[in-house]
Structure formats: C-alpha cells, structure tokens
Amino acid sequence: MKRRFMALCLAGSMLLMTALTGCQRAAEQANEGQENAGQKNVEQTERTEMETLVVPEPVSMEDNYRTYYEVFVYSFYDGNGDGIGDLKGLTKKLDYINDGDPVTMDDLGCNGIWLMPVMPSPTYHKYDTTDYYSIDPEYGTMEDFEAFLSACRERGIKVIMDLALNHTSSEHPWFQEACSYLKELGDGEPDPGECPYVLYYNFSKEKKSGFSPVKGSDIWYYEAQFWDGMPDLNLYNEELRAEIEKIADFWLAKGVGGFRLDAAKEYVTGADGSNIEILSWFNDVVKEKYPDAYLVAEVFSDMAVYEKYYDSGIDSLFDFDFANKDGIIAKVVKGNTPASFYSQRLQEIEGIFSAHNKDYIDAPFYTNHDMGRSAGYYAGEGSEAQTKLAGAMNLMMSGSAFIYYGEELGMKGSGKDENKRAPMYFSSDPSAEGMCRGPSDMDDFEMKFGSYEEQKDDPSSVYQYYKKAVYYRNLYPEIRKGTVNDLPE
C-alpha cells in the first residue's frame, strides 16, 4: 500500500539537525576549551537517545522493501588468516551489519545483504564462474555458506546472490567441451546431439565484433563481449534455460532470498527487447515456485533505457540516474543542480516506472563495485558534510536501498576496479585480526576518514550518521514504501 511520504521530511530533518548539532558542538568545544564538559554533554546526549529510542518493527522475510548491504567477500573480513576475506569471516562480522537485536544501536541495521559472486572462478572478482553449484575454495565450503545463511536468518537478514547469466568463465566445463568438439569437427557443421554445449554459447565461423578465436582453431570464433575469458551464453537455448532453472532452484532451496542479475543489458548485445524477454522468462520461473524471492537487475545505462526493463515484471532495477559522481544526488550535493530537482525527479519516476510495472520496487544506490567511492566526489571544506548528506539522500529514497560496503565509513577508492574493492576499513592497522590484503593490483592510497575503530564512538562521524539514517529508514516504513509529494512552502 502506497503512503504519503511525510516521513521523508521528518527523518531528513532529524538527520540534518544531527549533523548541525554535531558541528555546533565541536565549534563550541574549540572556542570555550571545555573538553571535559563537551565530552560529558556528548555522553549525556547518547544516553538520552538510547533511553528514548523507539524500536523499529521487524521486517518479515517476505517483505522485499529493505536496506541492502553489498559485500565483496574477498575484501571484507578474513576468517582463516590467509589475507583473503571468506564466508567464515563474513559470518563472524554479521553483528556489524545487523546483530538481530532491534533494541541495540551497536550495528549498522541493514536487513539485507547483496553477496557479490561466491562461486568458483579463476579471477579475484569471480564474475566468471566455472561451476554454478559450488562455493569458491578461497571463500570456504558449502557448509560455511549454509552456516552464513542460517546466521542471517536468525538476524532477519535476507540474502541475495550475484548471478552472472550473461557469460561463464572460459574455463567452465561447458565451454571447454564445446571448444574441444569444434576443434575436432573442423569445417563441418556442429551436431548438438553429439555435443549439446555448442549451443550453450554463440559460436561462428565468421569473426564478428566482440568475437574471439577458439584456441587451437583457425576456423571457429565465439562471442565474448567483455573479454575472451568470459564467453557469452546463448540464453535462447532451451537446454541452457533448463540448466539455469536448476541453478536458481538449487540456491533458492538452500534459503537464498533472491538474485542480483549481472549485466542484464548485455544478455543479447544491442537488443533490449530480447533482454526484456529473457528477464521475463527468468522472473516467471523463479516467482512460480518462490513468489517472495527478490530479483534486482543491473541495466547499466540511463533511465530512458532501463525503465523499459520493468516490462519484464522484475521486482527492481538499479536506479543509475541517481548514482555515481555525475548522478542526480552528487549534482544536488555539489550545488550544480537545484535541490528541488531531487524531489521532482523522485515524483516523476513513480509514474515512469509504474507505467511499465505497477508493482515495481525502486532500487536506489549511490555507488557500487564498478564506480569510484563517493568520498572522492567531494573535496575541501564541507566535504564530510557533503558525504553524509549524499548518503542520506540515497537512504531516504523509497524501495530497497543499497549501501556498498565501507561507504558508511567514507572509504576512498577510484580509478582501476581493484581500488574500488579495497579491504573493508575495520582498522587502520593492516595487520589487525581479520584485515584483508585486497586485490593484488590495487594501488596504495590513504583513506579520507577514520577506520571503524576510530569512528564508532564519535557521534559526529560519517559512520554514526549512516547508522542513524538506516535507523530512521527502518523506523518509518513510509520511507521505504511511500510516495513523494512536495510540501507547500
């Protein structure tokens, strides 16, 4: 049920008042030199907030309006001391994300986790899998994954997995068998009865744009739009579709709450209509057996393109127009666009999206693993306040909002992809327990704000600001589920 979005104004005002109060308190302490008295005031304020805390109502596992935390397991928390994040480490740090106790304010309060790929892969990012039914040994075992899911259920956290259906690894057995068959076949015509996997991919005797040569053959080529290590799948093949149905059922039966669908705009290169049909097929397959599963697709483009993908019936599409350094949020925060445009656009998208799917759930996000970290969008005096405001603007949008790990700490990282996936900044000591070494090609750079250890007890920190924004989002369902209206001046 849609409700008027009055809570947006209330919660937004509270957040801004908190920021202003924090700045004013710091200034007064500096001017008057009353450090002890200032500390006493801070402690008293924190006690008062805790004593008057209103506990948010729990969100049922069937409710797909949530606040998701995107986790790159490789860089989050190391549970076995090898320098690489893993599922045991993530499970150990779940209390950081959500401790399952709504009365406490020690956790961030997110009630959803988007798990970046965890299936076996030859790359550090793992978007090119070699096995859709297993866990990458770097991350642990299937038992570790099941223990993680169980711990999430206890805390009311819904877990969605990254599912890359556009391509596999070139080391996947399907692709390896198909290539071996074609090399032996030579210039003949492939028979799927002899090797069904030749129709799982897009092979051709003609070298087209985005096609790479089959190694060991001077006749055959295969489509690989991203790079030759990621051969594109032929998602119109019925045998492959049957396999994908089994893959989805395998994970959903284990208790996974849904999927983030990678690169949906690339399923069929340059063919939005075909991609929408494929999304519609997958959505129908999943929802027939798991009606409460949550599906959100990545259509990396502008709104004029991705709005059409709601015709598929999918729950959510990432709202790219508001994200990144040139998105609506950053433009408003920098003062390059009037603040009224933010409200205006929120109202406009309700009509735009609902015209395609009346049951849509918006998926606002501010940055992710493919974008520069948001703390780098702002510089100079006031940049901390800008970082906070931008985070709050994302979290005040309706739908299921997404936070990329470390954004709540104001982590930095730009340029090459590895820099955007740096180790979670739990501690400024890289040798501290659980700290990850990060991707091997990551540059050396310093963070802009303090680590979690340094921010957690500072009431005016970026972390505390994010935590309060998530709290208000949890407290007022109108923020997640409401519509937007301008208030009269």
What is the predicted function of each stretch?
Residues R25-A26, A30-N31, N36, N41:
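Asparagine/serine/threonine-enriched low-complexity, disordered tracts
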Residues T18-G22:
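C-terminal motif of bacterial Sec signal peptides marking the signal peptidase cleavage site
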Residues D284-G376, M396, E418, P423-D444:
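Glycan-recognition surfaces
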Residues M1-C9:
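Bacterial N-terminal signal peptides that target proteins for export
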Residues C23-A26, E46-A242, A253, R260, ...:
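Acidic/aromatic-lined carbohydrate-recognition and catalytic surfaces
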Residues G79-L94, Y377-E384, G434-D441:
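Short, polar loop/linker segments at the starts of domains and inter-domain junctions
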Residues L10-L16:
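Hydrophobic helical h-region of N-terminal Sec-dependent signal peptides
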Residues F365-N368, G380-E489:
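Loop/helix patches that line or flank the sugar-binding groove of alpha-linked glycan CAZymes
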